[in-house]
Amino acid sequence: MGIMDLFKKKSSGNVAKDRLKLVLVSDRANCSSEMMEMMKRDIIEVISRYMDIDAEALDVKITETESDSNNGMVPALVANIPIRDMKHRPDPR
């Protein structure tokens, strides 16, 4: 895969396939959409104590990753959190 492959637009079929994979992995991890939203709110609350983030652009999902211990695929929580700025003094809560 070359660097230019990163900028190619995915076909709607590939996008749908990726979404279905995420749904299946989330289902296997027994994680409902309500649970994902609760985790997202908690992550925003904790991270916001230390940095200014773009909460609207925050993306949290469950994917699969290779396990080091049993050579199989395991669920992994992945968070993409756009940081605007670091806070010089963390908010005490």
UniProtKB/Swiss-Prot annotation:
Coiled-coil positions are none
Gene3D superfamilies in the record, alphabetically?
Answer: Cell division topological specificity factor MinE
HAMAP family listed in its UniProt record: MinE
Q: Which domain of life is it from?
A: Bacteria
Q: Which gene encodes it?
A: minE
Q: Does the keyword Aminoacyl-tRNA synthetase apply?
A: no
What family classification does the UniProt entry report for this protein?
Belongs to the MinE family.
Purpose: Prevents the cell division inhibition by proteins MinC and MinD at internal division sites while permitting inhibition at polar sites. This ensures cell division at the proper site by restricting the formation of a division septum at the midpoint of the long axis of the cell.
Its recorded name reads Cell division topological specificity factor
Keyword Cell cycle among record annotations:
yes
- Signal peptide segment: none
What does the record list as GO biological process? cell division; regulation of division septum assembly
Keyword set for this entry?
Cell cycle, Cell division
Against InterPro entries, the record matches this protein to: MinE (IPR005527), MinE_sf (IPR036707)
- Which species? Agathobacter rectalis (strain ATCC 33656 / DSM 3377 / JCM 17463 / KCTC 5835 / VPI 0990) (Eubacterium rectale)
The transmembrane segments are: none
